[in-house]
């Protein structure tokens, strides 16, 4: 079951697709220029172990993806988080596994139904947990299967998903949890900087005025973190810079304009084509700083470290899908999204017990924005109490509707291209006996208003909630044309995977 590697120089640098031949058990791995390859493993990944050993299949502390031959089987490894994934497809002759849904569909010739209106809810279902998300995307060639957090095994029995190892750690005390985080950070940082890598990597922090990124920067600075990016303005324009913490920690800061992406041509496509909400598009403004980086992010810290969280399932239930929109985009500039709060997250009940223990009271601040574990780690490293975590802010754009944030449906170039695409696919709706959407922003505004009002009145009748509460709830404002953004973005990004 040997690997055969085929370099695809024109592909995004970190993209890969493995095609396994069922008859002779050979596996051909097509890959971009930045993927590490050896005789029995390949990866674009970092993990808590020796790089040359390639044991990323034997840990849950891993970011990125790859494949490993061991004991007569192949383990395809997904990131130990739900801000990334691998996907696979099977036909009569082969299995196909890739770290890009765009790559997989381009390679196999699969297409999605452009008239399907539930991509938004299907994609967001991952926040409900590993046992409740919709595990596949229907295409013209059959189902493409999605694997979050866990690993995919291929052997003589076929393909199956296998849980990652890593449960049963002792998090009975704050000191033990902190020691675990420190040891994990130390080994991951060593792995990042290993000289045996053909393509060198370097850690890059993300700093804001909040808890999560500050905690991660404190942990990583002890083991060589030198720089970080910050978006100096949060959603709504509030100051959210992490400059104060960066100065104390001695980190070099790169200030990023949160709206810089709006100046690009068709910037939204790679983020929406990730099969996600698209809300992490703000990172496009930092692209010149991201090549060859391992981005240490705080995704899921709002649940793992929050004192008041009720999300205590070992199946990794989240509050939002933030971070997932980087899945496709990151392959192009070539960086790895390392979401540190996911380390040990399946034992969130133990972590939550620490946050609420009596011994953590000195680091528990009044109000509903208290993360005692974060505060203790940061304050004991020398950060003043008032320098971080004083007010909860958000820097990402707010989900599939965020492109309305600046008053536009999409940026002008993307809007023009998307409406043209809608017009080109009119026949798909007619084939289903349905009227196609009219490619007009004005009509979209009117139709959206009608559907929003009618659906919210129905909800009001069913819930007996005061009508003004229903009409004021932004979570129910579905935008009509937004329902079809994913197949448009997918079409555009598949062009990056020509052979």
Model feature map: region roles:
Residues 1-261:
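Cysteine-centered catalytic environments shared across enzyme families
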């Amino acid at each position: 079951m040997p690997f055969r590697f085929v370099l695809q120089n024109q592909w995004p640098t970190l993209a890969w697709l493995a095609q396994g031949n069922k008859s002779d058990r050979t596996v051909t791995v097509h890959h971009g220029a930045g993927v590490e390859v050896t005789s029995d493993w390949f990866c674009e990944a970092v993990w808590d172990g020796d790089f040359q050993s390639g044991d990323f299949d034997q840990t849950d502390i891993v970011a990125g993806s790859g494949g490993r031959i061991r004991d007569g089987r192949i383990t395809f490894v997904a990131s130990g988080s739900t801000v990334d994934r691998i996907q696979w497809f099977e036909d009569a002759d082969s299995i196909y596994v890739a770290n890009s849904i765009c790559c997989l569909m381009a390679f196999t010739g699969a297409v999605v139904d452009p008239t399907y209106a539930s991509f938004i809810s299907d994609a967001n279902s991952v926040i409900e947990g590993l046992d409740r998300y919709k595990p596949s995307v229907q295409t013209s060639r059959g189902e493409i299967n999605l694997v979050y957090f866990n690993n995919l095994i291929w052997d003589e029995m076929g393909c199956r998903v296998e849980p990652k190892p890593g449960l049963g750690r002792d998090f009975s005390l704050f000191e033990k949890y902190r020691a675990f985080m420190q040891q994990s950070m130390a080994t991951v940082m060593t792995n990042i900087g290993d000289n045996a890598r053909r393509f060198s990597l370097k850690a890059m922090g993300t700093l804001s005025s909040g808890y999560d990124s500050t905690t991660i920067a404190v942990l990583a600075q002890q083991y060589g973190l030198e720089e970080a990016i910050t978006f100096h303005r949060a959603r709504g324009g509030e100051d959210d810079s992490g400059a104060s913490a960066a100065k104390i920690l001695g980190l070099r800061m790169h200030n990023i304009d949160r709206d810089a992406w709006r100046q690009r041509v068709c910037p939204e496509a790679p983020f929406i084509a990730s099969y996600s909400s698209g809300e992490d598009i703000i990172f496009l403004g930092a692209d010149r700083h991201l090549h060859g980086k391992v981005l240490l992010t705080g995704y899921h810290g709002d649940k793992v470290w929050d004192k008041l969280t009720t999300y205590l399932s070992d199946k990794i239930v989240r509050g939002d899908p933030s971070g997932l929109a980087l899945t496709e985009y990151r392959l192009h500039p070539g960086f790895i999204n390392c979401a540190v709060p996911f380390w040990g997250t399946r034992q969130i009940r133990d972590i939550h017990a620490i946050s609420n223990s009596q011994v953590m009271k000195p680091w528990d601040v009044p109000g509903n924005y208290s993360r005692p574990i974060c505060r203790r780690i940061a304050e004991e490293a020398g950060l003043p109490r008032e320098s971080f975590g004083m007010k909860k802010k958000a820097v990402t754009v707010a989900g599939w509707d965020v492109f309305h944030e600046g008053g536009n449906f999409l940026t002008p170039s993307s809007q023009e291209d998307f409406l043209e695409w809608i017009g080109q696919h009119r026949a798909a709706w007619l084939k289903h006996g349905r009227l196609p959407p009219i490619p007009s922003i004005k009509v979209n505004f009117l139709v959206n208003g009608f559907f929003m009002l009618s659906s919210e009145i129905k909800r009001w009748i069913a819930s007996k909630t005061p009508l003004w509460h229903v009409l004021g709830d932004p979570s129910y404002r579905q935008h009509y044309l937004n329902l079809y953004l994913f197949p448009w973005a997918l079409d555009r990004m598949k062009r990056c995977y020509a052979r």
